Amino acid sequence: MKKIIAILMALVLTAGFAACGNTATKTEDNAGSASDSDVLKVGMECNYAPYNWSQADDSNGAVPIKNVDNMYTNGYDVQVALKIAEALGKKLEIYSYEWDSLIPGVQSGKLDMIIAGMSPTAERKEKIDFSNNYFTSNLVIVKKAENLKDVKTIADLDGKKIAAQSGTFHLTALSEQTKAAANEMSDFTTMLIALKAGTIEGYVAEEPTAMA
């Protein structure tokens, strides 16, 4: 059973949805891209509860995942996307992307925006535009009940095998604020499997995700 250490990182993670607004002019190469139609194309992982997840039916207002057959997505990010599409008078299409492919998806014009709990870091702001933050959350460590019993402060994480998702603010915070033996992993499913297998002692997550 997973437990949460709610001490990690003396910071608040700010998350906002991103939209690409860096291209001021249109060319023949990007004509007919997502933003040129009456469809709003939104990218997310569809694997980051409670913000977004995948399910097999359309219960509770779930939306079809356009690029995954017979699967739907729901969650806070999905409901935000629906409201934005409604306000713009557009039909919503949600696409499931790996985390590292989300920003390139916007840059290439395949996506209109990302709604995926993405933090507006300086590096990302050089590539895409961000809205105002729509959510803030604390970072915590998810662990098994028998792990990390001696951890009371950030300093106690020294040498511990802690994972964080690659390409995220979580990994940066773990590396900069602790001397833990940081493990970089591709997604939260992989980290949870590693935790259950004993490969790692814990992983970094936002508090709502850790509790989901």
Regions found by a protein language model. Give the residues of each.
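A ligand-binding cleft/hinge motif common to bilobed small-molecule-binding domains
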Residues: 100-101, 117-127, 173-176, 189, ...
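Ligand-binding cleft/hinge of the Venus flytrap
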Residues: 55-67, 81-90, 169-187, 192, ...
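Soluble non-cytosolic domains of exported or imported proteins
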Residues: 71-79, 96-100, 164-168, 185-189, ...
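Short coil/turn segments
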Residues: 45-48, 70-72, 120, 144-148, ...
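Short, low-complexity disordered leader/linker segments with a strong preference
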Residues: 1-39
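Alpha-to-beta junction loops
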Residues: 89-91, 107-116, 160-161, 196-209
